[in-house]
Curated annotation (Swiss-Prot):
Coiled coil: none annotated. Keywords: Disulfide bond, Knottin, Plant defense. The presence of a 'disulfide through disulfide knot' structurally defines this protein as a knottin. Probably participates in a plant defense mechanism. Disulfide bonds join C4-C18, C8-C20, C13-C25. This is a cyclic peptide. It comes from Viola odorata. One of its GO terms (biological process) is defense response. The keyword Disulfide bond applies. The lineage of its organism: Eukaryota, Viridiplantae, Streptophyta, Embryophyta, Tracheophyta. Belongs to the cyclotide family. Bracelet subfamily. This is Cyclotide vodo I2.
Length: 28
């Protein structure tokens, strides 16, 4: 639920532990 400060285009995030949700990277 915490925004990782990264946008995701290909449903992948470069920041470890972060997942792509609705175009944004979130972690918990």
């Amino acid at each position: 639920g915490v925004f990782c400060g990264e946008l995701c285009i290909k449903a992948s995030c470069s920041i470890p532990g972060c997942e792509c949700i609705a175009g944004l990277c979130y972690k918990n």
